[in-house]
């Protein structure tokens, strides 16, 4: 059973996920490696909420949770499970359980294996508050998961079960969820990491209406990363990400052509340089564009996969003042 990426009917449990795609008769999708496909964010799911994690968990994956703690909240839990069966209960590799109803609110973390809870770990000084909004980011590494709350590192928990066994996310208890996001870590070692701050997903935000203009008042400096996340519309025609200088010239533009399924850099003078990569921008698919600025040019990553670099004069980089996004997309996040 597959569901759209919006809210769910009460009690709905999701056991698989797929990307709906509109195609012409006889048309076939180009083969795309699983590593290039990102699971779309889910907005306003009804709790309890259970969903498959597309591709399972692996080192370098992030799960972002945005929401509000109700004023009368007692507790809630976020479980990273090994399956989604109801009976027997699946193993839980990482159980994250904030508790508010005690005199000293705290978080309990634990692992459920073979129907038995193991030794629990407790963290005091809970950074979550009743009646307040939050952004929790789970960053999965090789040996442990790190958790940040509202941009501050909060805890780390060493795995007791193999991370590769985890394929399901469960959210239960007293929590109002605004969005759940599934991301890959920034692949650029020299670029800024999103953990622990995170950049929230926004649904139908006026600031992200397309065409979208994002100011770069200080220009761009080496190590700076631009993030663009969104969803391709049902009948896409074009998609461009351009960088403009003070004279409104665009020294460099990233353009996705839906007619011939190509991705290319377009210079100020209209010269095209094709990018060798699977074409990811299919209808109703989630995408992430990362641009890392470095000395002499910029690097590109799509959906967490590095795709090389293009050269650009350093002086031209410093004179850039605007990021402009246009085309057949719905934007969820733009950050620089």
Curated annotation (Swiss-Prot):
Galectin domain boundaries: 49-183, 212-336
Pfam families: Gal-bind_lectin
Main location: nucleus
Gene Ontology BP annotations: intrinsic apoptotic signaling pathway
Tissues with expression: Not widely expressed. Predominantly expressed in adipose tissue.
InterPro entries given in the database record: ConA-like_dom_sf (IPR013320), Galectin-like (IPR044156), Galectin_CRD (IPR001079)
Keywords of the record: Apoptosis, Lectin, Nucleus, Repeat
Entry comment, domain topic: Contains two homologous but distinct carbohydrate-binding domains.
Function field: Binds lactose. May participate in the apoptosis of adipocytes.
Cellular component terms per the entry's GO annotation: cytoplasm; mitochondrion; nucleus
This protein's record includes keyword Repeat: yes
Subcellular location: Nucleus
An MF annotation (GO) of this entry: lactose binding
Protein name listed in UniProt: Galectin-12
SMART domains named in the record: Gal-bind_lectin, GLECT
RNA-binding is among the record's keywords: no
């Amino acid at each position: 059973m597959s569901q759209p990426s919006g809210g769910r009917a009460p009690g709905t449990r999701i056991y698989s996920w797929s990307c709906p795609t509109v195609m012409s008769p006889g048309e076939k999708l180009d083969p795309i490696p699983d590593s290039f496909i990102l699971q779309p964010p889910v907005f306003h799911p009804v709790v309890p909420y259970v969903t498959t994690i597309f591709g399972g968990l692996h080192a370098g994956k992030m799960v972002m949770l945005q929401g509000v703690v109700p004023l009368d909240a007692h507790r809630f839990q976020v479980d990273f499970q090994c399956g989604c069966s109801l009976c027997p209960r699946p193993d839980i590799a990482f159980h994250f359980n904030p508790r508010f109803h005690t005199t000293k609110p705290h978080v309990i973390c634990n692992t459920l294996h073979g129907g038995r809870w193991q030794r629990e770990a407790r963290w005091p000084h809970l950074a979550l508050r009743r009646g307040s909004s939050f952004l929790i980011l789970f960053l999965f590494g090789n040996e442990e998961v790190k958790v940040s709350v509202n941009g501050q590192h909060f805890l780390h928990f060493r795995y007791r079960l193999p991370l590769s066994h985890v394929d399901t996310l469960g959210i239960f208890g007293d929590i109002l969820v605004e969005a759940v996001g599934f991301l890959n870590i920034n692949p650029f070692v020299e670029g800024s990491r999103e953990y622990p701050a995170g950049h929230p997903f926004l649904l139908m935000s006026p600031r992200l209406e397309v065409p979208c203009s994002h100011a770069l008042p200080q220009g761009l400096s080496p190590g700076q990363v631009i993030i663009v996340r969104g969803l391709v519309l049902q009948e896409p025609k074009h998609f461009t990400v351009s960088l403009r200088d003070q004279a409104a010239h665009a020294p460099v533009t990233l353009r996705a052509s839906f007619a011939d399924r190509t991705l290319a850099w377009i210079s100020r003078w209209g010269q095209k340089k094709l990018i060798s990569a699977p074409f990811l921008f299919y209808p109703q698919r989630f995408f992430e564009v990362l641009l890392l600025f470095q000395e002499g040019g910029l690097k590109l990553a799509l959906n967490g996969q590095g795709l090389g670099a293009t050269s650009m004069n350093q002086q031209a980089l410093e004179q850039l003042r605007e990021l402009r996004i246009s085309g057949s997309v719905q934007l969820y996040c733009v950050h620089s």
